[in-house]
Amino acid sequence: RVHENDLPSVEPQHNAAQRGAAWQWHEEFGDEAAIGTVAHAWLEHIGKEGLEQWPAQRIDASVAIMKTQLGRAGVSRAELDTAADAVRLTLVATLASSRGQWLLRVAGAYREWSLLDATGRVSVIDLAISEEKGWLVVDYKTGVPWPDDTPDTFAARMRERHGAQIQRYCSQVSALDGRPARGALYFPRADIWVEC
């Protein structure tokens, strides 16, 4: 059984405020940022512990912990069930996908990697994989296509929305050793891979 102390913590909003800088989610995305933060913490943990240790039943048994983490991240009580289900579905879908399994299994991957650029900006990269020809930088996303989306329209919208962010990540990783970096967005719930 999973215990809350075994997992990465998600800092409550009031702790950031006590340090003098309140952490605010972008309202336009609702609870999406909190869901993403909690899902990323779980994916990092599963990747480090090994996906064989995480059957779907263990994830299902961890929903109460997810709700606690989401609540601490600012999700309202009224939205906790929906938000926790989004995290659960993201994790289960990642484990069910061959691409998701590969991303969790890849040896020597840097997970939730904090990098500082020349301007002092910190970026937390979900996953960076050193390959023979350079780097692969992957940003997990918890969203799903709209009902009327085609794969191409969804990919184009996501490139528009997240492209600058993933390119910044690639630049930061490439600056470490001069090797090229390519970026991708991975949407486990829809099993969609978007090259950026």
Where are the regions that the model predicts?
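Structural signature of nuclease core domains in nucleic-acid processing machines
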Residues: 1-196
